[in-house]
């Protein structure tokens, strides 16, 4: 049965947002107009972001036995989103030819969605340790050895429509500012690639 992760904070890191819009990691000079828009759009984003996360923990025998789950005692599956409102607002800016504002708001949305995923990752790692199991790093469909087609399996497990998240024909999530991932729970710590534990 799927459960919700409650009280998800919205975290927005200016450096990561600036990197997403094309600035180097340690820019010496940032255009004043960019900084002004960043402040304005962060305020706007806080009104638009609706952070949600659903998860379910399955025994290995309940999974589809994909090789990425090898050696896991259990596997946690998670779906995170910030909702559709920010994306709609950003698209509106692009349609109005306000490209920089649209780009900045879109980057803020990406940072916010990843922030929800980081919060969920930590919550699920803590849950693993409560079960006396060892969590892996999170892994998402389409990365490394987990094909994008596995997105369907995640959506079979989790009631994504409760959060307003769907898959299109290309297996991309709508709203786009959504993140899905799996996390293996191991009985033996030797199998985990995670460097630190809560």
Identify the role of each PLM range:
Residues 1-101:
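Active-site helix-to-loop segments that bind/position phosphate- or nucleotide-bearing substrates
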Residues 17, 45, 90-91, 104, ...:
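Generic structural signal of hydrophobic/aromatic residues within well-ordered alpha-helices
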Residues 30-37, 105-108, 112, 116, ...:
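Catalytic cores of large soluble enzymes that bind and process phosphate-bearing ligands
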Residues 37, 41-45, 116, 120, ...:
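General structural feature for long, well-ordered alpha-helical segments within catalytic domains
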Residues 43-51, 125, 129, 159:
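Generic secondary-structure signature for well-ordered alpha-helical cores
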Residues 60-63, 67, 100, 130, ...:
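Charge-rich, low-complexity amphipathic helices
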Residues 69-141:
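Conserved mixed alpha/beta catalytic, RNA-binding, or beta-rich assembly cores of soluble enzyme
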Residues 82, 131-198:
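Short terminal or interdomain "cap/linker" segment that borders an active site or interface and mediates
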């Amino acid at each position: 049965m799927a459960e919700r992760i409650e009280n998800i904070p919205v975290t927005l890191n200016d450096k990561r947002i600036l990197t997403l819009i094309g600035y180097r990691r340690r820019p010496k000079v940032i255009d004043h107009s960019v900084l002004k828009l960043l402040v304005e759009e962060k305020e706007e984003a806080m009104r638009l972001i609706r952070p949600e996360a659903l998860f379910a923990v399955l025994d290995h025998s309940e999974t589809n036995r994909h090789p990425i789950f090898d050696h896991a005692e259990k596997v946690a599956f998670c779906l995170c989103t910030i909702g559709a409102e920010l994306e709609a607002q950003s698209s509106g800016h692009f349609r109005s030819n306000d490209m920089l504002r649209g780009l900045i708001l879109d980057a803020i949305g990406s940072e916010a969605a990843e922030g929800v995923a980081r919060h969920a990752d930590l919550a699920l790692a803590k849950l693993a340790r409560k079960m006396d199991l060892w969590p892996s790093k999170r892994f998402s469909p389409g990365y490394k050895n987990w094909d994008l087609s596995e997105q369907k399996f995640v959506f079979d497990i989790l009631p994504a429509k409760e959060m307003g998240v769907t898959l299109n024909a290309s297996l991309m999530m709508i709203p786009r500012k959504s993140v899905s991932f799996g996390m293996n729970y191991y009985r033996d710590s030797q199998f985990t690639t995670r460097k630190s534990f809560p």
